[in-house]
Regions:
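Extracellular, repeat-based ectodomains that mediate carbohydrate processing or recognition
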Residues: 1-196
Length: 196
């Protein structure tokens, strides 16, 4: 889905091991393209196809865009969806976070944003971020990796090329942390990563 028509502007999906699926999407509630009226919503579908919870995750006048979702294991039999989206609040860019179980219930113990996980209160993760796929033996919350693109300017100040970066979410003893950014790849001159 490319978000070109209708009020749904972005759509991503994930599935828990039991077959419960979730779709997350940004919704243009203005129907005029006013990005301050974009909201993030999600819905669940049981393994047998029964529709589950449909919920707005945001309802504000801030930019909320680029919803992402991944299924992660939070412990022995505790599988949940992790939702993330780019937001701009009071001029500050951040990645908002939400953990939701298969029944659609939001967690009240999961951090609300990446900036809440850093000592400085700032997380320099680009708005075009993605969650890396989790599968097999690497589905733990400690395997959750966020990937994004940063641009490098040339000597004249014009955008020249991109660098792909990643950071890993860590959980231990009731504390969530975000690793320092790691450079995955620097693209050649005059090359940008539109899709990764």
């Amino acid at each position: 889905y490319n978000g070109a028509t209708g009020s749904v502007k972005a759509l991503q999906a994930a599935m828990l091991p039991d077959g419960t699926a979730m779709a997350v999407y940004s919704l243009d509630r203005s129907e005029t393209g006013d990005t301050s009226d974009y909201e993030i919503a999600y819905c669940t579908v049981a393994a047998d196809g029964t529709p589950g919870t449909a919920m707005l995750a945001t309802c504000d006048s801030n930019l909320d865009e680029n919803p992402q979702v991944v299924a992660a294991n939070f412990g022995s039999v505790d599988d949940r969806f992790v939702i993330g989206w780019h937001s701009v609040r009071d001029g500050s860019s951040d990645i908002q976070l939400l953990a939701v179980d298969g029944g659609g219930t939001m967690s009240n113990s999961f951090p609300g944003s990446l900036s809440a996980l850093t000592s400085s209160g700032n997380a320099a993760v680009g708005g075009d971020f993605r969650f890396a796929s989790l599968s097999g033996d690497h589905r733990s919350l400690n395997d959750l990796t966020i990937v994004w693109n940063e641009t490098v300017n040339d000597a004249n100040g014009a955008v020249d090329h991109g660098i792909l970066k990643a950071a890993k979410l860590r959980y231990a003893t009731n504390t969530y942390t975000l690793s320092a950014p790691l450079e995955l790849a620097e693209l050649p001159d005059r090359t940008l990563a539109d899709h990764f």
